[in-house]
């Protein structure tokens, strides 16, 4: 699992936004609720491209109801460490149905579309975060 300490070491102070880009999502990867332009870490572009392609190719894209954020400088809810959203290397989807510490509702096939694209899913953690996908490695 990527930690905030690792992200800080690799990317530096998140408030400087040194590694952030505006990704113009290619037309063939446009997925309904995802913004056409996404502000994220440059290291998210290839994995997100792969995940979106997987969702489209497998038909699991129909399960994507909401996009609930990528870049947001903040601490993890209820904790003192910084969220990986602070460096734009995490994405939340379908948040209303996958609240923190609740049983996740995302299908295994949907999750696999992301985990096959170098993402780790928060739905398997002890402190379940079923809306959350973050880079598996940086």
Q: At which residue positions do the language-model features occur?
A:
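Detector for Asparagine
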Residues: 18-19, 41, 54, 72, ...
């Amino acid at each position: 699992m990527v930690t905030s300490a690792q992200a800080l070491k690799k990317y530096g102070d998140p408030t400087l936004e040194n590694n952030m880009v505006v990704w113009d999502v290619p037309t063939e990867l446009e997925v309904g609720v995802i913004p056409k332009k996404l502000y994220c870490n440059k290291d998210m572009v290839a994995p997100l491209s792969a995940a979106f392609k997987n969702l489209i190719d497998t038909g699991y894209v129909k399960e994507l109801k909401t996009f609930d954020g990528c870049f947001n400088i903040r601490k993890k809810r209820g904790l003192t460490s910084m969220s990986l959203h602070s460096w734009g290397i995490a994405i939340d989807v379908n948040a209303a149905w996958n609240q923190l510490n609740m049983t996740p509702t995302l299908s295994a096939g949907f999750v696999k579309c992301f985990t096959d694209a170098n993402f780790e899913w928060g739905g398997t953690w002890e402190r379940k975060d079923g809306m959350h996908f973050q880079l598996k490695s940086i």
